């Protein structure tokens, strides 16, 4: 059965049955996948508008309409109920066409990995790529200020510093310096550590005043109990938080105000949106968004931006007042929805009063400045692509570029990376890691040529099963003639010899082409060379980080892993009980046997492993293996 737009009779029949009540509509493709979820106070008018001939849809929505095979309706009593239901459905199904804002990686987020036993806090440019329990704050417009703030928080609060421990049996120097609570050796319980993370989350939510009051109470309690060392740490933390607040610009005289202000600037191709967060009279956050220009009314754009932003916000992060540059078409519905989420009344309006109007004007000026920056960046990216196509005599502009790099230490833990740039910008959803499988490549016997050949073979061997658009317009090999020759031999063997391929040597930034002995020289400062350097450096970073991760896993492998009968669960029990392998090694048989879940037989195996003669160890291991 064809899609609705190609089946006029079925489309007419479906549209005639539409009700005029409020509700939610779900657009589905031929496979039944939800493409888009929307709300409407009049479902008949809203859904019909998608299929009216000559309707000026944005390119994104026009593509979506062409894929609609059918739609589903859910009726509600009120428009506010429709907004709440739409929010829940979007969170559940994550339809691809409900994303208005561009995922351009321009602005960073701060992520807290609540899904982990000991949560991490880090800066990322990919929102929502992890576990649903993880929390994201942002996107922030000033990456430098964000990194500085995170650095200060790490000084004030002892936090997890690494993904993998440095040592198996003792904490690293960060613990000795008071920067980490020693969670790698479980010197702090998950409950205690998560309480610290909750305090940091309060800061990110703009609840610093509330946190300071809590810390003051804790300091007084510690001092009364004569725990002066703990009281001093709390005092230093309070001082640091006050210093952090001193750098925040006071924007309004009302010290209790909690409000967001949003404005936009647009040209023919792009919309730049800025949202300022004011809490307790201080500007605590400048968030930036961008979207492709669609010709929509500015009020409609702001409405959709706010809905998308607050959909991902916790109740504590919703302000009591939202100031908008333009009136919103459904401000009352949005205010009702936000009030239900927050549990308090939320006001939304385009201000006329001097102080509030000046705040919105300041946000609008920042949106205009950011739009100009984005335009300059876009022009430079396009110039780099055009210059590169000319310098390399490519058949077309390299919209999709792939770069490959190898990383190892003398053949140990050899890995490779693939990074992808689309229109001159990183497209991290296409990044890949590779573990080199060639058995000939081992410690002391590295072979970058064979490693590169393997990676290119694995990538293009599966190219036939991928959409045609996933083939690169240009392949960049991080290396000289040897690596390039190895890659080209494989590509030609797999019938992909027509894909343009170059090698980029690090030392002199020389560009090598297949079949040419002399390199192509691209002038320093040329946007084309800058583009090649960026993708090469990104591939190197991605490969090195993966190699470091693999090496860390190998180095931190516990000696307990060599004892039969001890899996992850029992290893955790033993380390929870004895804190480290050296302490367990010194324990008596009786102490080990008392450990819950271990038992006397396994305790004998463990004790013999650490203390017995080789023959005794072998007999104990054989007995345990036979018992299992």
UniProtKB/Swiss-Prot annotation:
PROSITE patterns: GIY_YIG, UVR, UVRC. Residues 20-99 form the GIY-YIG domain. It is found in: Cytoplasm. The keyword Cytoplasm applies. Its main location: cytoplasm. Gene3D superfamilies: 5' to 3' exonuclease, C-terminal subdomain (1.10.150.20), GIY-YIG endonuclease (3.40.1440.10), UVR domain (4.10.860.10), UvrC, RNAse H endonuclease domain (3.30.420.340). It comes from the Bacteria. Residues 209-244 form the UVR domain. Keywords: Cytoplasm, DNA damage, DNA excision, DNA repair, Excision nuclease, SOS response. Belongs to the UvrC family. NCBIfam families: PRK00558.1-5, uvrC. The UvrABC repair system catalyzes the recognition and processing of DNA lesions. UvrC both incises the 5' and 3' sides of the lesion. The N-terminal half is responsible for the 3' incision and the C-terminal half is responsible for the 5' incision. Interacts with UvrB in an incision complex. This is UvrABC system protein C. It comes from Gloeobacter violaceus (strain ATCC 29082 / PCC 7421). The lineage of its organism: Bacteria, Bacillati, Cyanobacteriota, Cyanophyceae, Gloeobacterales. The gene is uvrC.
